[in-house]
Amino acid sequence: MRIFLAGAGGVIGRRLTPLLRAVGHTVVGTTRSPDKMAALRVLGAEPVVVDAFDADGLMRAFMAAKPDAVIHQLTDLPFPPDSPRYAEGLARNARLRVEGTRNLVAAAQAAGVKRMVAESIAFIYAPGPRARVETDKLKPPEGDSATTVNAVIALEQSVLSMPEGIVLRYGYLYGQGTWSGDTPHPPAIHADAAAHAAGLALTRAKPGIYNVAEDDPSLSSAKAKGDFGFDAAFRFSP
């Protein structure tokens, strides 16, 4: 298949591109920076410079790429959690989840694409007495978390409006290139395993929402394990 990978230069996108290529897919990978095009080519992608906020540019990119499916791995978190500008980064990321996802979905639908796999987050469930599953309620959108919760809801609604929309609610990412480094913070997911999950979901998952994280008392990923073989222990060979 021809895969339009939005966010190919990100932490997950850099891992996912070679996984997709290894099983025979062609990857059209996006970046906002012309400086990253060479790196994407090395990974095996056909690079496209486009900004998710540029609806017209994104539409042109889709029409030129003619993809069979879309994988959405876009994030915009330039500042670490201990930065005084972290709140600014959260606001930017929230806008990307809302507007960027909306533009991706519109372009995909215009290009006749039915299947989209998109990243979301698994750490905004309302507290409960057992491990949270995909049908459990999210936190109410209030206080400091309101912007993030509202943005996640908008992202998921947009993706699930696709005929074959698949949402992967990742735990806190860790591994090389993440803010957490090699230290997992539960519910956690290594970036290698997150990329592997997206690759599996592309062809195996049914439309819907999946938790994707390591075993944790607060979160169940049983649905992802059962439906498409999610393996939290997956790592690239050194």
Predicted regions and their residues:
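Catalytic loop of short-chain dehydrogenase/reductase
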Residues: 125-157, 174-182
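Alpha-helical substrate-binding/gating segment
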Residues: 173-177, 185-210, 215
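C-terminal amphipathic/interface module of NAD(P)-dependent oxidoreductases
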Residues: 46, 50, 55, 203, ...
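Rossmann-fold NAD(P)-dependent oxidoreductase module
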Residues: 15-19, 107, 158
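N-terminal Rossmann NAD(P)H-binding glycine-rich loop of SDR-like oxidoreductase domains
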Residues: 3-25
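NAD(P)H-binding glycine-rich loop region in Rossmannoid oxidoreductase-like domains
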Residues: 32-98
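Conserved Rossmann-fold NAD(P)-dependent oxidoreductase catalytic core, especially the SDR/UDP-sugar
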Residues: 81-144
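Conserved beta-loop-beta element that borders a ligand/cofactor-binding pocket
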Residues: 115-123, 154-176
